[in-house]
Amino acid sequence: MALRALPRKTLQNVRTWRDWRRGDDLRIPADSTAVEDASRRFLLFGALPLWVVPGLADWWMHRRTRIEHTSGTKESAVHALMMTEAGIPVVMGLLARVNPLVLSVMGGAALAHGATAVYDVSLAVKEREVRPIEQHIHSFLEVLPLTALAFTACLHADQVRKTLRGGPDPQDWRLLPKEHPLPAAYLAGLAAIIAGGVALPYAEELRRCLRAAVGEGSRR
């Protein structure tokens, strides 16, 4: 009954996303040397999974400098914000059809992530030691979102042109599933990598900071 009460366009969106796995999976020939295939392989099997490595290294640097007793919950919450700024466009790029809406979100998120990164460092250096190696790790974390965005833009140059022209078609500003979804095995594997290498470590960091804040508050 609730579905029947929705507008026609909304119904179309619901049905489209309900059947988002029905299309043929995107296939990238492993032996192809075409620029488009090579770029897509680098993005999906290089940039995105390897993004976890500097993220995990940064978490270790925070732990080593005992973030829970220095900048504490405030900085850890900023890290959670930055993961959200990076995570939303990644999920959209993996599941949704790349169009002006998705590209605009990706661009806005990249700018927000960069601004938050500057605030994060300015906050951290006042409260704890930020070593040169950690600053170098930050460089990777700042450039990788831009790298992913650049490769996505090159793979969808037609949509970049539409974005620059204001997205004249109605579907340019609708969130739609990919015509050829990424293989379920790939999505599951990447989700496991992100969960184990990003979500769990930083959740542990935030929990550690909250517990330390409670402990310090009770001693006052």
Name every feature range the model reports, one short phrase each.
Residues 1-220:
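Short amphipathic, positively biased membrane-proximal segments
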